[in-house]
């Protein structure tokens, strides 16, 4: 690989520091401890944690829950269990599509919380990814997997997907809280959806559902979903609209992630500007937009940082491998080619991006040229949704490993003056 210029070296070093500091600021340990500090539960206490950050949240919570603790269950993504937790059974399952292990972990949680009394409390820790990981389907698993894959392939957004999921599940849309009744549920939620809609985060197992049957049916028809008669009938059934046994506390969000990244940029000498913390568009469009901003401001003579937080979507056109953050980086690479002082990175706060081992992607003004030297057609790779292999060929993958948190993604454009 050709030797990189000093500005690019500096940009990549800065990017690594920004990623590390931003993710550290939204780790759930301290947030869970704050939520449980001073809380007193008089009866028996049970712990259920679901989502990509479930193990980390449960580990922190277990240290706080000593008196009357009667057991717990964690259901998280493969590779996200980091050890044993006393008196807590840990399960790993499929994401973004549920599998048999997702169901096995959820069954354990349901069994743990059966036949509770009014004096009992279920501490429920919820994070993104819970829609796939915490599941008791009202359809055969294979059929539910097919519906999920249809929605993902159609580029449905997370609210649309979860509106459908709620009606096909025995635990979503407030139904888990109803299962726990008459016990009290204290829910601590790590938000991964823009605007923090509690009924949509992991499909709201303990929160009243604000969506309607009419909306669910409209989504199914608009995307041309191929559904069985049973599935159509379930979409027409309403979910719980009121719950009286739940207290909810939200902690951690993409807004905090962006603020932490901006603070890290400022500490490194950049002038940061958060463009949005509600990014929701095609991933390749986000990359192109940042490239346009880079070309507009590349000669301003300042160290600038433009930040966006949220969750883009990928329209599946090919059969390649990648994720939305990698696709942002690949798209940006084409637009910033030749700019020696520009770099774009995009990373998922949970450490995973699509069905890959990467958290995201990074590209600078030399990335597209390096791809050509390696025999990689960047445009074709983008069309094939094959950002993983394209970026991997030139050292453009970001790999953090599982972080233990999940508050959407952060995307950053860095512009640095020559030194």
Predicted ranges, named:
Residues 183-186, 208-289, 293:
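Accessory alpha-helical/coil subdomains and C-terminal extensions
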Residues 269-346, 354-355:
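Active-site segments that bind and position negatively charged phosphate/pyrophosphate groups
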Residues 1-44, 48, 56, 81, ...:
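N-terminal amphipathic/basic leader segments beginning at the initiator methionine
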Residues 75-119, 159-160, 164-165:
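Glycine-rich oxoanion-binding loops at beta->alpha junctions
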Residues 330-419:
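Internal helix-turn-beta structural module
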């Amino acid at each position: 690989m050709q030797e990189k210029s000093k500005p690019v070296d500096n940009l990549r070093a800065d990017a690594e520091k920004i990623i590390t500091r931003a993710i550290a600021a939204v780790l759930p340990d301290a947030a869970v401890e704050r939520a449980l500090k001073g809380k007193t539960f008089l009866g028996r206490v049970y712990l259920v944690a679901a989502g990509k950050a479930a193990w980390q949240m449960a580990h922190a919570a277990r240290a706080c829950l000593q008196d009357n603790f009667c057991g717990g269950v964690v259901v998280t993504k493969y590779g996200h269990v980091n050890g044993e937790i006393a008196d807590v059974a840990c399960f790993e399952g499929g994401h973004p599509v549920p599998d048999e292990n997702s169901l096995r972990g959820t069954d354990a949680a349901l069994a743990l919380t059966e036949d509770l009394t009014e004096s009992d409390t279920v501490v429920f820790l919820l994070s993104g990814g819970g829609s796939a990981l915490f599941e008791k389907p009202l359809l055969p698993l294979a059929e539910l997997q097919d519906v999920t894959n249809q929605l993902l392939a159609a580029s449905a957004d997370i609210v649309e997907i979860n509106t459908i999921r709620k009606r096909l599940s025995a635990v979503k849309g407030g139904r888990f809280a109803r299962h726990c009744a008459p016990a009290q549920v204290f829910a601590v939620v790590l938000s991964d959806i823009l605007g923090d809609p509690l009924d949509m985060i992991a499909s709201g197992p303990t929160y009243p559902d604000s969506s309607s049957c009419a909306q669910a049916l409209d989504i199914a028809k608009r995307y041309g979903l191929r559904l069985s008669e049973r599935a159509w009938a379930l979409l027409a059934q309403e979910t719980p609209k009121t719950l009286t046994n739940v207290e909810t506390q939200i902690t951690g969000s993409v807004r905090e992630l962006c603020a932490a990244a901006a603070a890290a940029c400022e500490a490194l000498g950049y002038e940061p500007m958060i463009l949005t913390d509600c990014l929701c568009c095609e991933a390749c469009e986000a990359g192109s937009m940042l490239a346009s901003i880079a070309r507009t401001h590349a000669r301003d003579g300042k160290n600038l940082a433009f930040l966006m937080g949220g969750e883009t979507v990928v329209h599946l056109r090919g059969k390649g491998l990648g994720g939305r953050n990698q696709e942002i980086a690949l798209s940006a690479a084409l637009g910033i080619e030749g700019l020696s002082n520009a770099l774009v990175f995009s990373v998922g706060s949970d450490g995973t991006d699509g069905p890959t081992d990467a958290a995201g992607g990074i590209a600078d003004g030399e990335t597209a040229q390096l791809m050509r030297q390696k025999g990689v057609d960047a445009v074709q790779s983008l069309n094939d949704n094959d950002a993983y292999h394209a970026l991997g060929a030139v050292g453009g993958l970001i790999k953090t490993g599982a972080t233990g948190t999940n508050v959407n993604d952060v995307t950053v454009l860095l512009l640095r003056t020559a030194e």
